[in-house]
């Protein structure tokens, strides 16, 4: 009796016994593993993303009224009521225009936003919270990495690649998303006067942003910029994408003071201005100040909503530690709770953390670094010990912070 011939996959060489299915063709066979690999290759070449179809409903837009938007933001961001109101109205108007079904001759323009405020005052957190509430794709990009087309660096179009990646390449969802451009102040042109040398990472980038902000169809490399020149491009319409820009604009308070003082007349007015300056000059910021800082008029014209964030004082920082839904102390308490340890703090510890955050000029973002420097040793040691409770005293916090490397980083 003739020996039965063993069948093999013509692609990977596996035998019939090593695979689940072996599909026969005219002159060969293919196993289920090679079929899956072939499907992946086809998807990459033809820009077919099955997961985008599978998750298409996960980014269903849910628009709320301005009061509801602010109420939601109050749960995550402490203070900054003026900024919350302005953002709530701008976001509501932006997405309301998408739902208008009656065709008429009145075209409602986009409400792109600029937020001015010191580092750690909540610009990024506000934008993140809005995107979470609306259930839309969200991408954060750093303006400092962009350069004008043709120079080393990333093209401005690459920010849309991140938006596509955030929604599994669902173009329809991405076209209703939010892009937060951080450090927008770092691409300010160097002076108001034209320069002979080309400013490829400043004014050149601002010029590149104009069409994106206004609304246009862009061919986007889905894997990002210039590293994959062979990839297929995806067409994205930015007409309904909301752009929120944030920056510290260090020194803009002097420009505001100069402008406000110029229009002040009389001794009493100047006295009141001095009181205002002692508090927060950012409340007077407008497009004129941003233009003098270095943003081009064309860019400012496409970002009509300007808001400011107040510097954080001690009471606000104290509340940030404990009050929001995802407050820092709640996060660390939960981490210890997972280990079966009940974490508690002396009230004076919170005041100590706030004092250091103000002293080191770190804002709310610095509170986490301070918490980490105080609790790192306990998070390292306690999981290996049979401890059920742990209280952070003021003496413990001072000792641990004093021996940490962070204590050496004090701002002069």
Q: Locations of the language-model features?
A:
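AAA+ P-loop NTPase nucleotide-binding core of proteostasis motors
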Residues: 2-24, 29-33, 40-79, 84-139, ...
């Amino acid at each position: 009796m003739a020996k039965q011939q063993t069948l093999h996959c013509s692609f990977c060489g596996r035998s019939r016994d090593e695979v689940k299915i072996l599909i026969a063709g005219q002159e060969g066979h293919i196993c289920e593993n090679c079929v899956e690999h072939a499907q992946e290759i086809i998807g990459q070449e033809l820009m077919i993303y099955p997961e985008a179809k599978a998750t298409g409903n996960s980014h269903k837009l849910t628009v709320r009224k301005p009061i509801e938007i602010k109420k939601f933001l109050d749960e995550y961001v402490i203070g900054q009521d003026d900024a919350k109101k302005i953002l709530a109205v701008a976001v509501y108007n932006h997405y309301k225009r998408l739902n208008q079904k009656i065709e008429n001759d009145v075209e409602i323009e986009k409400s792109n936003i600029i937020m001015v405020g010191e580092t750690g005052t909540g610009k990024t957190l506000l934008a993140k919270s809005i995107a979470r509430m609306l259930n839309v794709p969200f991408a954060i990009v750093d303006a400092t990495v962009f350069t004008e087309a043709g120079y080393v660096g990333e093209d401005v179009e690459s920010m849309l690649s991140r938006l596509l990646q955030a929604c599994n390449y669902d173009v329809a969802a991405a076209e209703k998303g939010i892009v937060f451009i951080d450090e927008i102040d770092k691409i300010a042109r160097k002076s108001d006067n034209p320069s002979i040398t080309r400013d490829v990472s400043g004014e050149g980038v601002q010029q590149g942003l104009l069409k994106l902000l206004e609304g246009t169809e862009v061919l986007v490399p889905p894997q990002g910029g210039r590293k994959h020149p062979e990839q297929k491009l995806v067409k994205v319409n930015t007409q309904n994408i909301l752009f929120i820009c944030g920056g510290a604009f260090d020194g803009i308070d002097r420009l505001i003071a100069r402008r406000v003082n110029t229009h002040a007349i009389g001794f009493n007015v100047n006295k009141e201005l001095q009181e205002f300056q002692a508090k927060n000059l950012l409340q007077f910021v407008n497009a004129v100040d941003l233009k003098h800082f270095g943003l081009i008029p064309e860019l400012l014209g496409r970002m009509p909503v300007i808001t400011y964030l107040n510097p954080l004082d001690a009471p606000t920082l104290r509340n940030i530690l404990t009050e929001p839904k995802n407050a820092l102390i709640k996060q660390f308490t939960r981490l210890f709770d997972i280990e079966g340890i009940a974490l508690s703090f002396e009230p004076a510890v919170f005041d100590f953390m706030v004092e250091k955050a103000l002293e080191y000029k770190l804002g709310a973002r610095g509170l986490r670094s301070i918490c980490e420097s105080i609790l790192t040793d306990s998070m390292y040691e306690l999981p290996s010990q049979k401890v059920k409770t742990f209280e952070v005293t003021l003496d413990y916090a001072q000792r641990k912070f004093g021996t940490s490397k962070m204590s050496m980083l004090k701002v002069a």
